[in-house]
């Protein structure tokens, strides 16, 4: 294969059978359980990279069920998103995500810079309870519960919240182990079609784990819980800050 052919075909590895396809990446019946909780402000400031700013000691803990996604298939995801601001623009900084499907792990890390790791999350309805769990190996590190569809939320308002800015710290090492890419990336969810939104009483329990340290941001108080169902497109990203260029 000539170098020109390599350049024209290069998208993802392996070259002849990429781990994930080109987009657009559309999700149908994407289901969220988002539990917002109050945590320790000092710990947030220690882990959120500047120039992002933390204004409130809040964390969104998410369990996301994706039964139908373009190229990525049927999988579930769980993790923590921290409300932040970038130059006055509010958004969410994804601290870590844990999922059970290789293509979105590879694609998420390589394309956008999603901090994804392999684990075993679930989101299901158990009689009258929406139940989210995260297992890392044999260890249960997160359990979230919410009363099933106790009260409807405004669909337009929830669509606007989903459409807000999202921020990622994309890191790709060079072959010598130094940083080749170290960028702050912004992306948006697009073409959002809300199908349902509810709230109810909720609980969240986090357990310590060396490799899935969700409990490093302790739950001090539950602030809000949302159960959302939507179709949406995961938009590609843009670099808003290059750490290596500074």
From Swiss-Prot:
Pfam families referenced in this protein's UniProt entry, alphabetically: ADC
Annotated signal sequence range: none
Catalytic residues (positions): 116
InterPro entries assigned: Acetoacetate_decarboxylase (IPR010451), Acetoacetate_decarboxylase_bac (IPR023653), ADC_dom_sf (IPR023375)
Keywords: Decarboxylase, Lyase, Schiff base
Protein name: Acetoacetate decarboxylase
Substrates-to-products reaction catalysed: acetoacetate + H(+) = acetone + CO2
Keyword Lyase: yes
Gene Ontology MF term list: acetoacetate decarboxylase activity
Biological classification of the source: Bacteria, Pseudomonadati, Pseudomonadota, Betaproteobacteria, Burkholderiales
Superkingdom: Bacteria
HAMAP family linked to this entry: ADC
Family the entry assigns: Belongs to the ADC family.
Function field: Catalyzes the conversion of acetoacetate to acetone and carbon dioxide.
EC number: 4.1.1.4
């Amino acid at each position: 294969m000539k170098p020109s052919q390599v350049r024209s075909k290069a998208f993802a590895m392996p070259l002849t059978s990429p781990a994930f396809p080109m987009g657009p990446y559309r999700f149908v019946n994407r289901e969220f359980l988002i539990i917002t909780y109050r945590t320790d402000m000092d710990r947030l400031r220690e882990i959120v990279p500047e120039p992002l700013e933390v204004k409130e000691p809040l964390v969104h803990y998410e369990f996301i069920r994706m039964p139908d996604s373009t190229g990525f298939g049927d999988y579930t995801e769980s993790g923590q998103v921290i409300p932040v601001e970038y130059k006055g623009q509010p958004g969410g900084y994804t601290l870590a995500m844990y999922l059970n499907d290789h293509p979105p792990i590879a694609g998420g890390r390589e394309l956008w810079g999603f901090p994804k790791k392999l684990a075993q999350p679930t989101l299901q309805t158990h009689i009258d309870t929406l139940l989210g769990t995260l297992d890392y190996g044999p260890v249960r590190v997160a359990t979230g519960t919410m009363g099933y569809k106790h009260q409807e939320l405004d669909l337009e308002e929830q669509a606007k919240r989903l459409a807000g800015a999202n921020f990622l710290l994309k890191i790709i090492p060079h072959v010598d182990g130094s940083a080749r890419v170290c960028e702050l990336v912004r992306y948006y969810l697009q073409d959002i079609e809300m199908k349902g939104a509810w709230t109810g009483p909720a609980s969240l329990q986090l357990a310590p784990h060396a490799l899935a340290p969700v409990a490093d941001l302790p739950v001090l108080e539950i602030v809000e819980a949302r159960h959302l169902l939507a179709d949406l497109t995961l938009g590609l990203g843009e670099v808003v800050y290059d750490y290596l260029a500074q």
